[in-house]
Curated annotation (Swiss-Prot):
Organism: Brassica napus
Superkingdom of origin organism: Eukaryota
Protein name: Acetolactate synthase 3, chloroplastic
Database matches in CDD domains: TPP_AHAS (cd02015), TPP_PYR_POX_like (cd07035)
Homology family: Belongs to the TPP enzyme family.
Length: 652
């Protein structure tokens, strides 16, 4: 039987399995049992959008690395489906997986023990595993691999898959499934994970023939890393894992509906039109997002040639150095005043690798209302989805920038671009509305803690975060110099992301300084991953900004709900004068050094100690809960609604 997939553009026609057919009800599967008669279900098309990473082993033809692969099996030697699956991962260059075993996936784990090249980093929860795989992928550009068992193991991956889908992160998730004969019978630990994840994966597969494993794995990696990166799920029934077979590694991929829609290189005429608009403008601004992360060199050259200031989305941080004089840092709801001012007053908005999401635009009709808009993105579905551009290019931002840079270099004398007056105007805004914070006695402003960390690491650390106030402060006050330094759940906003993401980043970058800047609410959601950090001896540093509250929700309570507290206090109401829970004891239980700091004057030394201590370390920084993330444009608001003053000490 052919492998079942979730998307109609991919061919379902294949030779029937040579293995003994099993009596499976046609009502129990999310696809038609007759290849010539596809299911009448509506299928979601495969998404293609802004590139985040260079494709890794994704060319349709075999690469030299795959050609020279040496198998530990003789070519005609039968082996289990699980061993075929693991070897398929090896052939894709996989060196690390984040896998938690269970009844329906233990065959895969047994096969992993027979691999001499793949390391399994054992998370303490499947959500920790998928977030760690994301951290690995986001920090390295390579696809992250996570493995879970059927039922609750698979459903525990859902938040991570949705997160990777929204942020365009290349993931391959492999799940065990109940044996084929039990599918649809409500068997123990059975969930229809293909159906569950249909709308939060770029594509997914239910493997129904052991012979299809080599092709499916190759396709999964190609889909995850080409076009718009994203998560792909491969669901493998246990009897498929146990079945003996001789793999055919030369099977071609069958992705006609996908391959035909991959964007072509941008046309010279389109790029020339954009250069003409630049030459005619007086107040241009760059608006760059996650789709520009793989184009930082080309973007830097473009800015050098044009002198156009750069504003970044949360996902785009690091694509252009935040400490450069032409950087406006982040725009949007909690972006800098000067970045939002630039967009508000621009006459040309160059939107590269972005999707005009609500946290950036606020009220769509008012966003960049005076500007001509140029939108370059590799996903045709994103162009015109929220904001209609005057000029659009559906293609790779990297190729578009390379092409425009050539045009600009060839026409430099003719164009003589000079936006000095505009840059001076924006410099005045920087002087007038800098990112700032207030100090109250000995209390530690959370912004100051991040500022000190930036100074002591010289802006070279890889930073992961949870979600909330600390996330926004980390985006504002740490100056990212390069892409892939900033790892954060941007589109989904998943709390609990920071700690496991730091694990993945540390595994992918063993020589890097990796710091999880976290809040007490987010941190405790995946606190069990401290055990993984200790067992794997990963030098992850945790800068915990602890205010005993759900800070961002509390900020909205202060501003819009008359400070009425609705379950945002995370401490013990019976012991409000004590820090609860004691995060140091969590660290101590896992054998991780930890310390607490409560006074501003002691903070710098405490952070330096954290950085100097070999291995992992947790620093519990006690912060006042009254702090607000500013600037702030209320949801659905415009630049005119920007809030720059106040905190929880004021009544509104």
């Amino acid at each position: 039987m052919a492998a079942a997939t979730s998307s109609s553009p991919i061919s379902l026609t294949a030779k029937p399995s040579s293995k003994s057919p099993l009596p499976i009800s046609r009502f129990s599967l999310p696809f038609s049992l007759t290849p010539q008669k596809p299911s009448s279900r509506l299928h979601r098309p495969l998404a293609i959008s802004a590139v985040l990473n260079s494709p890794v082993n994704v060319a349709p033809e075999k690469t030299d690395k795959i050609k020279t692969f040496i198998s530990r099996y003789a070519p005609d030697e039968p082996r289990k489906g699980a061993d075929i699956l693991v070897e398929a991962l090896e052939r894709q260059g996989v060196e690390t997986v984040f896998a938690y075993p269970g009844g329906a996936s233990m065959e895969i784990h047994q096969a992993l023990t027979r691999s001499s090249t793949i390391r399994n980093v054992l998370p303490r929860h499947e959500q920790g595993g998928v977030f760690a795989a994301e951290g690995y992928a986001r920090s390295s550009g390579k696809p992250g691999i996570c493995i879970a068992t059927s039922g609750p193991g698979a459903t525990n991956l859902v938040s991570g898959l949705a997160d990777a889908m929204l942020d365009s992160v290349p993931l391959v998730a492999i799940t065990g499934q109940v044996p084929r004969r039990m599918i649809g019978t409500d068997a123990f630990q059975e969930t229809p994970i293909v159906e569950v994840t249909r709308s939060i994966t770029k594509h997914n597969y239910l493997v129904m023939d052991v012979d299809d494993i080599p092709r499916i794995v190759q396709e999964a990696f190609f889909l995850a890393t080409s076009g718009r990166p994203g998560p792909v799920l491969v669901d493998v029934p246990k009897d498929i894992q146990q079945q003996l077979a001789i793999p055919n590694w030369d099977q071609p991929m069958r992705l006609p509906g996908y391959m035909s829609r991959l964007p072509q290189p941008p046309e010279v005429s389109q790029l020339g039109q954009i250069v003409r608009l630049i030459s005619e403008s007086k107040r241009p601004v760059l608006y760059v997002g996650g789709g520009s992360l793989n184009s930082s060199e080309e973007l830097g050259r473009f800015v050098e040639l044009t002198g156009i200031p750069v504003a970044s989305t949360l996902m785009g941080l690091g694509s252009y150095p935040c400490n450069d004089e032409l950087s406006l840092q982040m725009l949007g709801m909690h972006g800098t005043v000067y970045a939002n001012y630039a967009v508000e007053h621009s006459d040309l908005l160059l939107a590269f690798g972005v999707r005009f999401d609500d946290r950036v635009t606020g009220k769509l009709e008012a966003f960049a209302s005076r500007a001509k808009i140029v939108h370059i993105d590799i996903d045709s579905a994103e162009i015109g989805k929220n904001k209609t551009p005057h000029v659009s290019v559906c293609g790779d931002v990297k190729l578009a920038l390379q092409g425009m840079n050539k045009v600009l270099e060839n026409r430099a004398e003719e164009l003589k671009l000079d936006f000095g007056v505009w840059r001076s105007e924006l410099s005045e805004q920087k002087q007038k509305f800098p990112l700032s914070f207030k100090t109250f006695g000995e209390a530690i402003p959370p912004q100051y803690a991040i500022q000190v960390l930036d100074e002591l690491t010289q802006g070279k650390a890889i930073i992961s975060t949870g979600v909330g106030q600390h996330q926004m402060w980390a985006a504002q006050f740490y100056k990212y110099r390069k892409p892939r330094q900033w790892l954060s759940s941007s589109g989904l906003g998943a709390m609990g992301f920071g700690l496991p993401a730091a694990i993945g980043a540390s595994v992918a970058n063993p020589d890097a300084i990796v710091v999880d800047i976290d809040g007490d609410g987010s941190f405790i959601m995946n606190v069990q991953e401290l055990a993984t950090i200790r067992v794997e001896n990963l030098p992850v540093k945790i800068l915990l900004l602890n205010n005993q509250h759900l800070g961002m929700v509390m900020q909205w309570e202060d501003r819009f709900y008359k400070a009425n507290r609705a379950h945002t206090y995370l401490g013990d109401p019976a012991r409000e004068n004590e820090i609860f829970p004691n995060m140091l004891q969590f660290a101590g239980a896992c054998g991780i050094p930890a310390a607490r700091v409560t006074k501003k004057e002691e903070l710098r030394e405490a952070i330096q100690t954290m950085l100097d201590t070999p291995g992992p370390y947790l620093l519990d920084v006690i912060c006042p809960h009254q702090e607000h993330v500013l600037p702030m444009i209320p949801s659905g608001g415009t630049f005119k609604d920007v809030i720059t003053e106040g905190d929880g000490r004021t009544k509104y």
